[in-house]
Amino acid sequence: MSRQQNPLIQVKDLKKYYPVKTGIIPHVTDYVKAVDGVSFSIYEGEILGLVGESGCGKTTIGKLLTGLEKPTEGAILYRGMDILDWTAKEQKKYRTKIQMIFQDPYSSLNPRKHIYEILAAPMLYHGISDKQTVQKDVKELLEMVGMPQSALGRYPHEFSGGQRQRIGIARALSLKPEFIVCDEPVLS
């Protein structure tokens, strides 16, 4: 595979430290270094796997890449621009370009929403679909992940772990992202 000039995603000296608070009047006594000085680049069409023991920071890196967490230090560049310097409007647009398939599909799906609502809402909110096309688009997503259309009116608790994971995958694909972070997507 020939690499382009610029990476799609570039991570430079990324750090995420969580404070440890102790005492009756809690004060910071130390930090847990969940991510400490990580750097890598990912080019279009490339797949990168992070391998490591439990608790080594793989999920935290995914959350940092998607903007769900803010780093303590470092830079995350998307097409050469640091996402940490962006306005809220620019970050909203970025979140349509990068999606995450979560390790636990049950906790990532709203238990009060039907599957149709879970899949349709992001497409409508971000302008991927409109009211005329959203139903067709949702059905296509279900077909892509091997789920029957009868799933649309059901709630997440009515599915097996594997089926919920496929719904989570469909939701990640719903925004037609350029980049997907998969946090142990075949665990369930």
Model-predicted segments: where are they?
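Conserved catalytic motifs of ABC-family nucleotide-binding domains
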Residues: K176
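Conserved ABC ATPase signature
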Residues: Y155-F159, Q163
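Conserved ABC ATPase "signature" region
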Residues: T133-S150
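Conserved ABC transporter NBD signature motif
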Residues: G74-D82
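Hydrophobic anchor residue at the start of the ABC signature
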Residues: I169
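Helix-to-loop junction immediately C-terminal to a conserved catalytic motif
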Residues: T66
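The feature captures the beta-strand-to-loop junction immediately N-terminal to the Walker
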Residues: V51-G52
